[in-house]
Amino acid sequence: MAQATPYSYTERKRIRKSFGKRENVLGVPYLLTMQKDSYVAFLQKDVPPQKRKPEGLQAAFLSAFPIVSHNGFVEMKYIEFNMAKPAFDTRECQQRGLTYAAAVRAKLQMIIYDRETSTSQSKVVKEIKEQEVYMGEVPLMTDYGSFIVNGTERVIVSQLHRSPGVFFEHDKGKTHSSGKLLFSARIIPYRGSWLDFEFDPKDILYFRVDRRRKMPVTILLKAIGLNPEQILANFFVFDNFRLMDSGAQMEFVADRLRGEIARFDLTDKAGAVIVEKDKRITARHTRALEASGTSFISVPEDFLVGRVLAKNMVDADTGEIIAKANDELTDSLLKKLRTAGIKDIQCLYTNELDMGAYISQTLASDETADELAARVAIYRMMRPGEPPTEDAVQALFNRLFYSEDTYDLSRVGRMKFNARVGRDTAEGRMVLANDDILDVVKILVELRNGRGEVDDIDHLGNRRVRCVGELAENQYRSGLARIEKAVKERLGQAETEALMPHDLINSKPISAALKEFFGASQLSQFMDQTNPLSEITHKRRVSALGPGGLTRERAGFEVRDVHPTHYGRVCPIETPEGPNIGLINSLALYAQLNEYGFLETPYRRVIDSKVTDQIDYLSAIEEGKYVIAQANAGLDKDGKLIDELVSARESGESVLTSPERIQYMDVAPTQIVSVAASLVPFLEHDDANRALMGANMQRQAVPVLRPEKAFVGTGVERVSAVDSGTVVTAKRGGVVDYIDTNRIVIRVNDAETVAGEVGVDIYNLIKYQRSNQNTNIHQRPIVQRGDQVGAGDVIADGASTDIGELALGQNMLVAFMPWNGYNFEDSILISERVVADDRYTSIHIEELVVMARDTKLGSEEITRDIPNLSEQQLGRLDESGIVYIGAEVNPGDVLVGKVTPKGETTLTPEEKLLRAIFGEKASDVKDTSLRVDQGTNGTVIDVQVFTREGIQRDKRAQQIIDDELKRFRLDLNDQLRIVEADAFDRIEKLLAGKTANGGPNKLAKGTPIDKAYLASVDKYHWFDIRPADDDIANQLESIKNSLEQTRHSFDLAFEEKRKKLTQGDELPAGVLKMVKVYLAVKRRLQPGDKMAGRHGNKGVVSKIVPVEDMPYMADGTPCDIVLNPLGVPSRMNVGQVLEVHLGWAAKGIGQRIGDLLQQEAKIADVRKFLDELYNKSGGKSEGLNGLSDAEITEMATNLAQGVPFATPVFDGATEEEIRAMMHLAYPDEIAAAKGLNATRTQATLHDGRTGDAFERPVTVGYMHVLKLHHLVDDKMHARSTGPYSLVTQQPLGGKAQFGGQRFGEMEVWALEAYGASYVLQEMLTVKSDDVNGRTKVYESIVKGEHAIEAGMPESFNVLVKEIRSLGIDIELERN
């Protein structure tokens, strides 16, 4: 077998012809990495306790422990945690309605210190108690990134939230009517109080904590220990003045004078006037002053008045403070200063342009005196009404920003903070320091002064992703915090009452927090399981909603918009339509998270305009520093950029630049879109809105009975099918040993088995399992016995996959033409043949549940003995009263018989007599059996019976357990058979030709052992042979031991399985027995079903037309589906037309290959044709020479139905390539027979009803069409009588409540307009809420009369009651 090919076992069966022009430097990464890695890091289950990193569960424990008692003499210390094995596997949890979880046990030490000898510095240990304590159950992730909670599969969606750190922004001039920009800053911790700084329109700077009342920022600066002098020194530069007897002198600083207007004549040292009064001072003037050696300039007295002092002014003799820092100079103050003999004074230098006096003004408005007063002011703001004692004040201030218990910036926050305030290090303390607050205020003042830039909060460098692990850790922490409080209270008692750790710790808070999160959080969602794509997309979703995120109502347009940093990180296309648009996004194909939780995307390094194979992952912040070329930039064969100007991105803008400036290049053209969008062929030719619909609707495609690969794909089909986990892939390579519809057994290659492991892999396939959306999950083997498979090869197909590729719909022969108005407004016309061939038939599985409860009147019973039912109605039930598997059932049929005791009723004499005669007890119970719903027909495919512990099982339950055990035993026997065969093969090789010291069948000493002898001895007696060579004897012994060990472990596994199955089931309170019945319902295509292509071209089936009436081609081929051509131009999704053309070529080439096979052409001819197709028609070339003749024949057989093409997104087939494919598919004679035109894109069609040709050629071809999960069967609904609302007595609404059709206000107007008064009266009374009237109508219809007596509608009585409740009495007069 030619194994040296680059193709896997399944790829060899059918190679997709790709039109991609770019070489693939980096394959698509595993698509569920984000979910799985995050949770692995959270649990660190397989890491030895000593080597665990402080993250996830470990971090949660480390943050809560050690707990010290109030008196300090008892301490609870955490050592390590470990996790138990889960009691049930995923399959069992789904069946039993349990959560797939593992128990966490923490090893804790309680240390009690000796009171007498311990001091606060050195404590003496009195005793240590160590114990493992149960700490709740943590849900485990399944192999495919989901969780099983209470039996249903759920996904925890990742959250995109604002990164912790510091942000500077302005209000864009919206707050104040003048349009002035008000700047603000906000320090956001991971947990703890937010600290905001903001300017008001008067340019005073305020701060607020947790959005409370605002206070001048200088209060905070005083509270962190700065006095007014220090505050001013931090924010201003000073002007130095010397006081003279009259006037003063100012120190000359050239930069501060330049550009100002002189308020007096400026003179130099010699007294010469350099600048006259009211003239502007220029650089020439300042140079002249410098040249003359002037260091001080004479200024008049009034130049000083109004200046602000920078320092306190103290009388040197008396020590009295004459003026305080930040006081304004006045004439009287100047006089005082002169009197005190003070010569030198320092004033703040401010100007209007770039040195505002903001902090000085703020300080002036602040009335607090010192540090304590400032802290008291903050205390009053945080705790209004509480008396501020000094201890309480200091404690509160420290807890706000300085305590690690209440404030945590997190590593990310510290890194972002340091980067923003311009520090070089990314490390630092997780609480705020005084420098931090000061730096933020400085930057904010600089911004107001016009220096620096504000942050863009929608930039992905300022938004980070919180994954499952992190969200779960936060919940576990909150549970531990509650435990910590409780333990702290009780630790004091531990030393007196000799308590152990488990007496103090109650794990309920942890369990409650986790249960609430996994069961009811906004981010824990019921998994969308319609098809493999919907699963994978759900797990890759990133939501801005959820706790700690945005809300739909408050989110504006900016947050929802596509941002330049989304490139390669978040898909710009795939997002829901409606209120959540832009808030829920999908991860791009290659995106991943870095250690801080920011999204990164890969780029290829470019050095000297040559592209290297080095790949770097860049976050949004790093990306801004580089010039990055697009993936489609032209390269020569050595990887050098060849264009003179290359289109590139630089700091968020698209530019054309020279190749030398390029530093990185995109990895692949598909890099910018998500999985769903990358599955849309010719996406680049579709309008963005339609592409969005196309990507979203693929997730709603229902798996059909026989999936068919898309003729036109994009090359992502295989990856998405494999990563979704729908298909079965081989864990290890080997040979297929056994195969049937339920299981595949593979004998693993020797090279891939580790010593002590069993060399057998058994894959149990899923058969007819119900998905969350009631679609059918079903796996089919695609390997044969004896096939050689490699690790990772697909060995079984699942729902919506075809030979390991995603296949969501069917390829349909489409004609774009109108047809009698049946395709008006996007309606779809379909041929009857499509329905007859079951092309769109899907299987839906419904789960029906019945519970037998314990009631006040006695317990309910599941039984076949049901009152008032004929034998015929009970025909499908077995002796236990449960329906047989395989029974076909219709609406109203009994599935599970159940009777409920009813209260004693007074009996008539006749009944008493009958009872006395027959001892009849049947009348005490009423029939509450489980019946099939209205409108449901199906086949029973599975029944499960759950019985509470201590209640005897019925025969059916016992039989189900026996079948399950039989299946399990079969698996074990298979494994054992292969292991034994392998062992005996090894023994035969070991012993053949060796000398023996004796053995069974009187083997003489010194006789050589040959194969004939071995064949004559029973294999199990080979172990009794005694080889002469000790080494061989030892090897024989070790094989024997390992076989025995394997047998023993299998027996243990079987015993464990039996114990699991035979123990009682956990059922809800009061439930004794529960039966689940699964019905498979076949849904054929019918008018009213919604269908769609992959380009947002959706419609509803309007009519199913007989084959003979459909338009047909010259050779008699009828079309499958007729679409309206008007649906294309206005919607601008031209991709669908290109898909149709390429699909048409795919089918034609397939038919040509089929003809070659049919004519039994030489294999060389087939190879030649395939070579022309794959290697001589553009796109990627394939190495077909490595395939054997048998493989080529098998591949050709698979291709005969149609050749699958791949046109990758943004790198797809060109128009010329499509035309070339058309000509390869339809040579002249075939084209003529089909009535095609010269370009092969259109054909002359004939009307099926008349046989006449249509007057114009019609575009025909193959399109991949999906049937969506909006089926008319689920929506159609009719009611005659049914339930009514309790208060208004009007019929309920909606199918689920079996409600009526609402006859609304506007419909009433319509009847009024026609004067149909009696119809209207009926609608408002007897058909709605006239209780007596509707009963009478029912009676009269039964009697065959047709009179109607309308009475008082109940809603009128409700209105009267409501008016009375307002205190207005209304009485109705009767006439």
Curated annotation (Swiss-Prot):
Gene3D superfamilies: 2.40.50.100, 2.40.50.150, 3.90.1100.10, DNA-directed RNA polymerase, beta subunit, external 1 domain, DNA-directed RNA polymerase, subunit 2, domain 6, RNA polymerase alpha subunit dimerisation domain, RNA polymerase Rpb2, domain 2. The keyword Lyase does not apply. It catalyses: RNA(n) + a ribonucleoside 5'-triphosphate = RNA(n+1) + diphosphate. The keyword Isomerase does not apply. It is an enzyme of class 2 (transferase). Keywords: DNA-directed RNA polymerase, Nucleotidyltransferase, Transcription, Transferase. Its EC number is 2.7.7.6. GO terms for molecular function: DNA binding; DNA-directed RNA polymerase activity; ribonucleoside binding. GO terms for biological process: DNA-templated transcription. Pfam families: RNA_pol_Rpb2_1, RNA_pol_Rpb2_2, RNA_pol_Rpb2_3, RNA_pol_Rpb2_45, RNA_pol_Rpb2_6, RNA_pol_Rpb2_7. PANTHER family: DNA-DIRECTED RNA POLYMERASE I SUBUNIT 2 (PTHR20856). The RNAP catalytic core consists of 2 alpha, 1 beta, 1 beta' and 1 omega subunit. When a sigma factor is associated with the core the holoenzyme is formed, which can initiate transcription. DNA-dependent RNA polymerase catalyzes the transcription of DNA into RNA using the four ribonucleoside triphosphates as substrates. Belongs to the RNA polymerase beta chain family. This is DNA-directed RNA polymerase subunit beta. It comes from Methylibium petroleiphilum (strain ATCC BAA-1232 / LMG 22953 / PM1).
